[in-house]
Amino acid sequence: DEGLVGSEMCIRDRDISDDKDLEETNLVKAKDVACYIFTSGTTGVPKAAICPNQKLMAASINIKMAGYRIDESDCMHNSLPLYHSTGLMLGLCAVVQAGASTFIKRKFSATSFWDEVQQYNTTALVYIGELCRYLANTDPTQAEQNNPLKVMVGNGLRPDVWDVFKDRFGVNRIVEIYGASEGNALFMNLLNKDKTIGMTNADVSLIEYDVADDKILKDDDGFCKQILTHDPGLLIVRIGVNAVFNGYTDAQATEKKILRDVFEEGDAWFNTGDLIKTVDVGYALGKTHYQFVDRVGDTFRWKSENVSTNEVGEILNGFSDVNMSNVY
């Protein structure tokens, strides 16, 4: 049953036909390509990242079960492009896995958002940081009071906006996600801690990176140097059987993202191109938690210290008189 008004659509019921296992389905393998997702081009021109069925399934199942924790009684608000990882994997695919309903809108509107939440009783939200910032900057409305929204999953939520969604909008569970379309690791704030991308089961490491010279630092033996403190480091993910790096359609572009002989001869790691640091979030089942710092290239040196443009921006955005800042 679909309700369609202009560019809005609410999918309420699942297909309950008897043909659940069509003859053609046995021709589709887990390793087959489900789709190509183009990267945002932060380190060059956009590239087509390969997304096989197994990655699409695994990510959406984990996000549905451990992230949203939704079921058939829930409805998700999704106004993100379905050709991007967030709108597709974190949004639509997670809904399908849960058997839940979803409200899909072609274009996000901050002024009508809470009216839509109330009208369609949306209990879950898939977000990106800018979407949340728009909502935080709106004047209080009657529709936002006693709203049914209880959980939100996405990426890029600013620390100051995080507080707004907890305190003003009353969202109990915020699951910040970190991962790349082409990457082989997923970080998730499973324990609902504040202002963190959470934890991961992947074999990851933070290595020393010289932001001034834009290069990885190595020891006398030619191997990378691990960071053992809470200082920011370049995040890398070991490539292996349980952490496959599918890469891009361009083989040369794929090879450029792989670091070899990192800690020992023959090992291979995916270079995320992001600076990450560990954070203390209190009791967390002994699991290390992380926080996004900045993209490589968006950091500068000041008085012999590495300074993240993103962190400077977060401090400026914490002032009530600042609507938005961009530091570069």
Q: What do these predicted regions represent?
A:
Residues 13-17, 39, 56-57, 254, ...:
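Adenylate-forming
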Residues 1-11:
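Single conserved hydrophobic/aromatic residue that forms the stacking wall/gate
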Residues 97, 119-128, 136-211, 224, ...:
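Gly/Ser/Thr-rich phosphate-binding loop
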Residues 57-75, 83-123:
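Conserved AMP-binding/adenylation subdomain of ANL enzymes
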